[in-house]
Amino acid sequence: MTEEEKTKSEAEEIEQNNKEEEQEKSVEELLEEKEQEIQQYKDKLQRIHADFENFKKRSIKEKQEFVKFANEGLILKVLEAYEDLERALEVKEDKNLREGVELIYKKLTKILEDEGVEPIETKNQKFDPYKHEALMTEDNDDYENNEIIQDLQKGYTLNSKVIRYSKVKVCKK
């Protein structure tokens, strides 16, 4: 083998090695790109999974809230009868009638309490527009400004949510 052939052969070998290195680099680059792509898909899947879990929790909470207040309309109707019984109890003439009405009143009171219904307190309270509806105002020296003078119609909450505002007379100075 001549010197020229030897040099030519070495040059071909170097060129072949360069091609192999380029192919290795392109395979490595391709592999790295695919690994990055896989990581992006994993991240996306993780976000979607977290979003779905949050959606499930929110749906459960909304369902619980719906169930909690589903009886609101019925309770508002029962409250009217409940208050009629309250007024009937104020009549003290017929003892047997009164005892029967008291029994019904106590049962209704227990039912409403068990369902989460509570009357809104107005005695010695300041007017709160989130709980009370002012139907009348009066300048009265016996009360402070914005203090409730009289409860004209009871208000109620269902599980701490106002379902009927107390209708009140308020002191305004």
From Swiss-Prot:
GO MF term set: adenyl-nucleotide exchange factor activity; protein homodimerization activity; protein-folding chaperone binding; unfolded protein binding
Chain intervals with Basic and acidic residues compositional bias: 1-28
Pfam families to which the protein is assigned, alphabetical: GrpE (PF01025)
Keyword Chaperone: yes
Biological-process GO terms, alphabetical: protein folding
GO cellular component assignments: cytoplasm
PROSITE patterns: GRPE
Similarity comment text for this entry: Belongs to the GrpE family.
Function, as annotated: Participates actively in the response to hyperosmotic and heat shock by preventing the aggregation of stress-denatured proteins, in association with DnaK and GrpE. It is the nucleotide exchange factor for DnaK and may function as a thermosensor. Unfolded proteins bind initially to DnaJ; upon interaction with the DnaJ-bound protein, DnaK hydrolyzes its bound ATP, resulting in the formation of a stable complex. GrpE releases ADP from DnaK; ATP binding to DnaK triggers the release of the substrate protein, thus completing the reaction cycle.
Protein name per its UniProtKB record: Protein GrpE
Gene that specifies this protein: grpE
